[in-house]
């Protein structure tokens, strides 16, 4: 047990450096694209959202190769090297005269970082948990995940304050150079624990098992399901076909897929071996059904991620046109995300200590709120956050008009500190939605698909970035709400539009959540 904790510190230390470097780029990326690559406001915000989306989309790549081919450790090593090389390219693009303002070099470095950082995300936490025995699941593993989450939060906090301040005051070369050194230290730290790690062999991808169910069901399209479900192929009958750790109860939903478990003579070769592309167990079929049931609810979490993405894109651009002085101190607009992180750090234990006991009195449930109820409350806070941003922008435009700055590309006298409420509201929403979402996916995913569900959770962040980019691009092309001079624009209308979409999204979530049928194990 003690050795497991010691080994996990190598992994937590590596993740800390990875998070500081990743958020150190992401928090200030829109500003970098405007000042170094001379992009306009909409393009910079859209490209920053696209980059953040891609960095989480690549989590699927990491999850696939780790499960199917390389295992978690080798996947982390290889993609950390790519991460490091991307930072080297990015640093050179800001330091070498002939590469300055080179979009190709800058984006090459940025997307190498997106690939390296994203692909390690679903592997790092799983690899840390692998260091503990199964008997430690409820104690040691729980402590590891708590420290792991805290590490990510502290890393984001340092990135949004110290790293952003260095970039704004000492330049991009020094800022990116320090992040490059940090990832080099992370890689060295990871390798230094190599002889102690417990590495599990890859057991095959859940994608393959799901494809087998679809193919087998299609091959038996014209066959009738037996009235007695016990005539279907069960994992307990053929232990060599057991792909996961859990026997799931056969369900009537998506009944077409149940045909994959109909036993027929053509399912066996002449040597008597089973063909997994012709016959699947009922538990294997239920694995796919479990994922399909999650998808409608999963889709509603994408818009929440889109709201979170705006903290480092549109919120930053709004802040640029506000007074960033606090006495003799100049506040970088990107550093306001610190209030989101601080809210998460403070509100997470408050949720356990205060909200759960109060909710328990009303619901009678041990955990107070169900995972879906918790996630739904987070979606509600996304609406309030956007309303707050819209009201603030409307007031900022009013001040710009009063001060005669509508046609001047300068900041108004209104303090940037007025952005704090919208960042705090997003942070509260994350405590409810993001943690509720992860707990829900972990609880409802079959044992053999939990890594896939972790990747799906990360994918919502990716798609949220793309959604923000699409909304920004379309609204500006159609309405022109977000010009380079925001004093002449109507960013408030953009925020109102997103508020309306969030309200519609909450209604869709309530509809599917109220009809969701929970997984039942045998």
Q: Where are each of the predicted segments found?
A:
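Hydrophobic transmembrane alpha-helices of multi-pass solute transporters/permeases
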Residues: 1-522
């Amino acid at each position: 047990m003690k050795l497991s904790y010691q080994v996990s510190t190598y992994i937590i230390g590596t993740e800390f450096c990875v998070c500081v470097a990743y958020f150190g780029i992401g928090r200030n990326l829109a500003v970098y694209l405007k000042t170094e690559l001379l992009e306009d406001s909409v393009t910079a915000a859209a490209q920053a959202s696209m980059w953040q989306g891609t960095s989480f989309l690549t989590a699927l790549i990491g999850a696939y190769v780790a499960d199917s081919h390389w295992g978690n450790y080798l996947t982390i090593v290889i993609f950390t090297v790519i991460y490091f090389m991307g930072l080297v390219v990015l640093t050179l693009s800001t330091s070498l005269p002939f590469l300055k303002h080179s979009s190709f070099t800058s984006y090459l470095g940025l997307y190498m970082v997106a690939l390296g950082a994203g692909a390690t995300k679903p592997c790092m936490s799983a690899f840390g948990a692998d260091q503990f025995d199964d008997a430690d699941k409820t104690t040691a593993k729980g402590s590891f995940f708590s420290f792991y989450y805290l590490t990510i939060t502290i890393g984001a906090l340092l990135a949004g304050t110290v790293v952003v301040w260095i970039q704004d005051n000492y330049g991009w070369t020094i800022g990116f150079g320090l992040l490059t050194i940090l990832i080099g230290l992370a890689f060295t730290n990871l390798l230094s624990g190599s002889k102690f790690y417990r590495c599990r062999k890859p057991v095959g991808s859940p994608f393959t098992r799901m494809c087998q169910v679809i193919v087998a069901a299609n091959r038996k399209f014209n066959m009738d399901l037996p009235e007695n479900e016990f005539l279907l192929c069960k994992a307990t009958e053929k232990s060599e076909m057991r792909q996961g750790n859990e026997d799931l109860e056969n369900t009537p939903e998506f009944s077409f897929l149940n045909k994959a478990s109909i036993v027929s003579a053509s399912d066996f070769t002449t040597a008597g071996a089973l063909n997994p592309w012709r016959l699947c167990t009922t538990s294997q079929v239920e694995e796919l059904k479990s994922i399909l049931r999650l998808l409608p609810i999963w889709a509603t979490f994408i818009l929440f991620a889109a709201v979170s993405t705006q903290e480092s894109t549109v919120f930053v651009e709004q802040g640029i046109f506000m007074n960033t002085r606090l006495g003799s101190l100049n506040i970088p607009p990107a550093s306001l995300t610190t209030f989101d992180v601080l809210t998460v750090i403070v509100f997470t234990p408050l949720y356990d200590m205060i909200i759960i006991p109060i909710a328990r009195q009303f619901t009678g449930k041990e955990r107070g709120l169900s995972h879906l109820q918790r996630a739904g409350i987070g979606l509600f806070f996304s609406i309030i956050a956007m309303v707050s941003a819209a009201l603030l922008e409307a007031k900022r435009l009013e001040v710009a008009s009063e001060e005669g700055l509508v046609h001047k590309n300068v900041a108004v006298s209104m303090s940037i500190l007025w952005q704090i409420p919208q960042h705090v509201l997003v942070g509260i929403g994350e405590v409810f939605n993001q943690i509720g979402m992860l707990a829900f996916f972990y609880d409802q995913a079959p044992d053999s698909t939990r890594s896939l569900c972790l990747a799906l959770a990360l994918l919502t962040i990716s798609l949220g970035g793309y959604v923000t980019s699409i909304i920004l691009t379309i609204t500006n092309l159609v309405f022109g709400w977000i010009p380079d001079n925001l004093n002449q624009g109507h960013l408030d209308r953009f925020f109102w539009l997103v508020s309306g979409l969030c309200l519609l999204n909450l209604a869709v979530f309530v509809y599917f959540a109220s009809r969701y049928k929970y997984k039942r194990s045998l």
